[in-house]
């Protein structure tokens, strides 16, 4: 019996399942909610194929169902599917609420990681600035030439000491002309008067774009109020 190739990562297992059961799993785009108990169905249908173990299948399912694209698919009115794409009933409200909380927690973790990275960059920039501001080696003053007796000192012309203040640099933003180019999870800014607030795309609807501000508040905004 020939040795079958082995899948080494959960992503490879998901790609295999998407090819093996295209009406149930997807490798990209919004995912469909899975039937409850689908793990046992997988063990029965693909057990032994590609040298897959139960542990690999369980890890791949955990990664698949915790991804943002899967959690976005768990919404009111959606139906669960089995391995062949057959409907297995509409989602319960408690499952939709659980998925919503998981998605919010995942986004909060990403924002915390970004804030930590930005803080490290600021610390590194500050450290580099301190090195540049280190005192330089003091130069010895040149000896002053003696004036001849009777020579008069010429008055120096006064130099202007004040400089015209620079105009504050206006931050430039690129308006969002087409919301179809946006993707879920993308970072942009929402215009509010003369200010622009950081936000993250949650959903693209026919009425506009649903975004979440750094404060945690979510709202639907029209394209003319969005900039990069």
Curated annotation (Swiss-Prot):
<dbReference type="InterPro" id="IPR016103">
    <property type="entry name" value="ProQ/FinO"/>
</dbReference>
<feature type="region of interest" description="Disordered">
    <location>
        <begin position="108"/>
        <end position="178"/>
    </location>
</feature>
<dbReference type="Pfam" id="PF17516">
    <property type="entry name" value="ProQ_C"/>
</dbReference>
<feature type="compositionally biased region" description="Basic and acidic residues">
    <location>
        <begin position="146"/>
        <end position="175"/>
    </location>
</feature>
<dbReference type="InterPro" id="IPR035236">
    <property type="entry name" value="ProQ_C"/>
</dbReference>
<keyword id="KW-0963">Cytoplasm</keyword>
<keyword id="KW-0694">RNA-binding</keyword>
<comment type="similarity">
    <text>Belongs to the ProQ family.</text>
</comment>
<dbReference type="Pfam" id="PF04352">
    <property type="entry name" value="ProQ"/>
</dbReference>
<dbReference type="InterPro" id="IPR023529">
    <property type="entry name" value="ProQ"/>
</dbReference>
<dbReference type="InterPro" id="IPR036442">
    <property type="entry name" value="ProQ/FinO_sf"/>
</dbReference>
<keyword id="KW-0143">Chaperone</keyword>
<comment type="function">
    <text>RNA chaperone with significant RNA binding, RNA strand exchange and RNA duplexing activities. May regulate ProP activity through an RNA-based, post-transcriptional mechanism.</text>
</comment>
<dbReference type="GO" id="GO:0034057">
    <property type="term" value="F:RNA strand-exchange activity"/>
</dbReference>
<dbReference type="GO" id="GO:0033592">
    <property type="term" value="F:RNA strand annealing activity"/>
</dbReference>
<feature type="compositionally biased region" description="Basic and acidic residues">
    <location>
        <begin position="117"/>
        <end position="136"/>
    </location>
</feature>
<dbReference type="GO" id="GO:0005829">
    <property type="term" value="C:cytosol"/>
</dbReference>
<dbReference type="GO" id="GO:0010608">
    <property type="term" value="P:post-transcriptional regulation of gene expression"/>
</dbReference>
<protein>
    <recommendedName>
        <fullName>RNA chaperone ProQ</fullName>
    </recommendedName>
</protein>
């Amino acid at each position: 019996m020939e040795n079958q190739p082995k899948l080494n990562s959960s992503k490879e297992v998901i790609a295999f399942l998407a090819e093996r059961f295209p009406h149930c799993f997807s490798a990209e785009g919004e995912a469909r909610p899975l039937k409850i108990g689908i793990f046992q169905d997988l063990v029965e249908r693909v057990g032994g194929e590609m040298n897959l173990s139960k542990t690999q299948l369980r890890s791949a399912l955990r990664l698949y169902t915790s991804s943002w694209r899967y959690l976005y698919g768990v919404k009111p009115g959606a139906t669960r599917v089995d391995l062949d794409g057959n409907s297995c009933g509409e989602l319960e409200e408690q499952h939709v609420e659980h998925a919503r909380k998981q998605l919010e927690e995942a986004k909060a973790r990403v924002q915390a990681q970004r804030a930590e990275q930005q803080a490290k960059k600021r610390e590194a920039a500050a450290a580099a600035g301190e090195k540049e501001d280190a005192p330089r080696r003091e130069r010895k003053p040149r000896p002053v030439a003696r004036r001849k007796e009777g020579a008069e000192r010429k008055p120096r012309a006064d130099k202007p000491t004040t400089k015209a203040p620079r105009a504050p640099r206006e931050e430039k933003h690129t308006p969002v002309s087409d919301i179809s180019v946006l993707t879920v999870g993308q970072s942009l800014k929402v215009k509010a008067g003369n200010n622009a607030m950081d936000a993250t795309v949650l959903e693209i609807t026919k009425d506009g774009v649903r975004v979440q501000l750094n404060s945690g508040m979510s709202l639907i905004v029209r394209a003319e109020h969005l900039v990069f």
